[in-house]
Amino acid sequence: MGRYINKGNDGFASVCNSKFVDKTMLIEEVNLVMDTENRFLCVTRARRFGKSVAVKMLNAYYDQPCDSKSLFNGLSISRCDDFLEHLNCHRVIYLDMTDFLTKYGGNDELLVRHINHDICEELLSLYGPVTMTGNDDLMDLLVKIVDQTGGVGRSERCPESIGLSAHVCS
């Protein structure tokens, strides 16, 4: 389990052990746009509207190294025909922006630089040596990893899975 990449399902497991409203049908909505032009999503709501819980849920559902089936059994999403299609089939980059905002607050340039640095560092530790130039950033590194590995997110159970998926919470 990484700090940002393949973070695991502990966050959602903790939510499941508490009282919570089942919003797992959000997963069905994301699955519907997964391989379309509309696949880039931004979830914005006021404070205290459950964004963090939703992102923990999405992370637990998609995160490839996990086995989250038991967490979702009995929840609304488990009754959908395509429940298993994307379950634990994707590499996930999980960012909770509050961590970065607390540390780097009003300095947007520093904030972006540290996000790039921290995630690149973790990617390089996971996926080995990747040739980078001094001008490369996170997006360049993601493209190079997919090019060099033939698709980081692929697995035997989910051969069609997209290289990397990113979910951002702020």
Feature names for model-found ranges:
Residues 1-170:
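Phosphate-binding site recognition
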